[in-house]
From Swiss-Prot:
Ranges that cross the membrane: 324-344
Record's GO cellular component terms: endoplasmic reticulum; membrane; nucleus
Location of the region described as Leucine-zipper in the Swiss-Prot/TrEMBL record: 281-295
Protein name listed in UniProt: Transcription factor atf-6 homolog
Function per UniProt: Transcription factor. Plays a role in the unfolded protein response (UPR), perhaps mainly during constitutive endoplasmic reticulum (ER) stress, by activating transcription of genes involved in the UPR. Plays a role in modulating lifespan, acting by positively regulating expression of calcium-binding chaperone crt-1, thereby influencing ER calcium homeostasis. By activating the UPR pathway, confers adaptive protection to subsequent exposure to hypoxia. Involved in protection against proteotoxicity, probably acting via the UPR.
Leader peptide range in chain numbering: none
Length: 589
């Protein structure tokens, strides 16, 4: 407003205390002074002002309107008639809050948007200052009408569940499983119910009992809470659960925990075992202490007795008696030693140096420069059979008339076996005749080749050499054959006899399986064989074995005869071994 050409701010307090307040103030409408526009504000229910649609103004307690000079009940509000009561009501109108601020908290329902009817704007609605102009009769404009439509809220239900101190079992139909029920605490209320309870407690301090809405007509129905009072426990039967899959890291951790737990259990058991042993030893020690104390008491009791007095004997007689007892003891020990000793003294003293009997049928002449012939050989005598003084059944010394070979016979037997092994070895058999071990056809062809070529690798074999010239010629031929053997190289043999080399490797494998000894001959026969069992069997006698093997004839054989080599053996041990079919297939003809 412009008073006396001076612009003042729109401060209501300054206007009221201004002494130069214009007398035309009673003609102004309070709506424009209070709010600056023609819009009206809502009034609270606690205020003494009421909003009226007829005069669009405020009425006081006595019914008069504020700011309307047309009212007959009260004069218009001015500085002269603005009383103290009006001042208080005026201040209250500015201090009171809107009644719709806590609408949602009071009624528990969301606040709905107000229906506002907008009226056409005019040039006076946005004016901040009022000028003194002659009143113009403007057409009556409609004020904004605010209609509050509260949302109907459902009655709040409060369900209070009390815990029951009993456990019930409900027996269902025979086809269904039994379920065990247990008592649980009341479930937590829903968030909406908790909010409603908090809102009610904000405005009501005393407990409020729920009043259920009943129908106007019809029988009374009691509303029962649908909240479950019992929660079923899992059934007692096993439930098939899917196997849980763990990662490698989880499996490693589980294994580590298992191993650690097992280690702790073992340590605990070991500690308990040690404690038990310690307890037993302590008990045994206590028992021994008790017995020792008892023995000491008995010893002390006997020590108090008087000692027995012995009459001393002469010194010479006692010394002689001791010597006799010592000599008798020595003789007794010597006799026991002679009886129990495993050494046969008599047999060792009665050893005869004569050559033992050897069967002439199996004797052969070896290839040596100096060989004793059959005619010039000394007579061989048999050892007279006599029973020794000490005959031990467990000893193998005198069982079955065992013979002992002298140096000459030992050399002869070794040469015979070595010759047989060399003839039947893979290296000395010609490749065109080699068909496998113990192959009869191969042996027949080999014998025929030996007849055609009597001078073999080993030289000619004769019964006796009487003249020195013949002996010299024989030695020269042997040297010649040895030199020819030295000219052969191993490469040619390997190139020509690849199959034989493979068989040799297989035989080496078999020898490693058998654990071959250096001084033992091992013979494997894989074709038909004939067994001649022993006629006399003894449990304490050493078993003997005689092998009959095909051999090379010495001086030629007849058409219907075949030469065999007999090998007498003494069994020193037996054992079993396992060979594969592939290894045996190389040895089969």
């Amino acid at each position: 407003m412009n008073f006396d050409n001076t612009v003042h701010e729109s401060n209501f307090d300054d206007l009221l205390h201004n002494p130069n307040f214009p007398p035309q103030f009673d003609q102004l409408e309070l709506d424009s002074l209070l709010y600056g526009t023609d819009e009206s504000q809502e009034s609270t229910s606690s205020s003494s002002f009421g909003f009226s649609d007829q005069n669009a103004g405020f009425r006081s307690r006595d019914g008069g309107s504020l700011g309307d000079s047309s009212s007959d009940s009260s004069p218009p509000l001015s500085c002269a008639n603005f009383t103290e009561n009006d001042q208080e009501m005026w201040d209250f109108g500015f201090q009171s809050r809107s009644p719709f601020e806590n609408f949602e908290q009071q009624f528990g329902s969301p606040y709905q948007d107000d229906e506002v009817i907008a009226e056409p704007t005019n040039e006076f609605m946005n004016a901040r200052y009022l000028r003194e102009e002659p009143a113009k009769h403007l057409p009556m404009q409609q004020k904004r009408i605010i209609t509050i439509l509260p949302k109907q809220s459902q009655p709040v239900k409060r369900i209070v569940s009390r815990p029951i101190q009993k456990v019930y079992r409900v027996k269902e139909s025979p086809g269904s499983q039994q379920q065990t029920y247990r008592v649980v605490q009341p479930l937590m209320p829903s968030p909406s119910q908790a909010t409603q309870r908090q809102i009610k407690q904000m405005y009501y301090n005393e407990p409020v009992q729920e009043i259920h809405m009943q129908p106007k007509s019809g029988p009374l129905v009691r509303q029962v809470s649908e909240e479950p009072r019992y929660v079923p426990i899992a059934p007692t039967v096993d439930i098939k659960a899917e196997p849980q899959v763990f990662t490698s890291e989880q499996n490693r951790k589980i294994r580590n925990r298992m191993y650690a737990q097992a280690s702790r259990m073992r340590k605990k058991e070991a500690d308990e075992h040690m404690k038990m042993n310690l307890q037993e030893l302590l008990q045994e020690n206590e028992i021994l202490r008790t017995e020792n104390a008892a023995l000491k008491q008995r010893l002390a009791f006997f020590e108090h007795e008087e000692p027995v007095v012995e009459v001393p004997q002469p010194f010479g007689r006692n010394q002689k008696k001791k010597r006799i007892i010592a000599a008798g003891s020595v003789l007794m020990m010597f006799g026991l030693f002679a009886v129990i000793s495993p050494f046969n003294v008599d047999n060792n003293l009665n050893i005869n140096n004569q050559i033992m009997a050897i069967s002439n049928e199996t004797s052969m002449v070896a290839r040596h420069g100096r060989v004793i012939t059959y005619e010039d050989s000394a007579p061989v005598a048999k050892i007279p059979t006599q029973q020794p003084i000490h005959n031990y059944p467990n000893s193998t010394q005198n069982d079955c008339d065992m013979y002992k070979l002298n140096a000459t016979e030992t050399i002869r037997v070794n040469n015979d076996i070595e010759r047989w092994v060399q003839v039947h070895s893979f290296d000395n058999v010609p490749m065109k005749f080699s068909g496998g071990l113990l192959n009869k056809e191969a042996m027949r062809k080999f014998n025929y080749a030996q007849k055609v070529k009597p001078a073999s690798v080993y030289g000619p074999q004769t019964l006796a050499v009487q003249k020195k010239s013949e002996q010299a010629a024989l030695r020269s031929r042997e040297r010649t054959w040895k030199q020819l053997d030295l000219l052969k190289t191993g490469n040619n043999i390997q190139l020509d006899n690849e199959k034989i080399q493979r068989k040799r490797q297989d035989i080496d494998k078999i020898a490693s399986i058998v654990r071959q000894k250096g001084d033992t001959l091992y013979i494997m026969t894989l074709q038909d064989y004939v067994l001649l069992p022993s006629l006399i069997k003894g449990a304490n006698s050493v078993p003997k074995l005689s092998l009959l093997l095909p051999s090379v004839p010495m001086n030629g054989t007849l058409q219907d005869q075949y030469t065999l080599l007999r090998v007498d053996c003494e069994v020193t041990g037996t054992g079993q071994l396992t060979l594969s079919n592939k290894q045996l297939s190389y040895l089969m003809p």
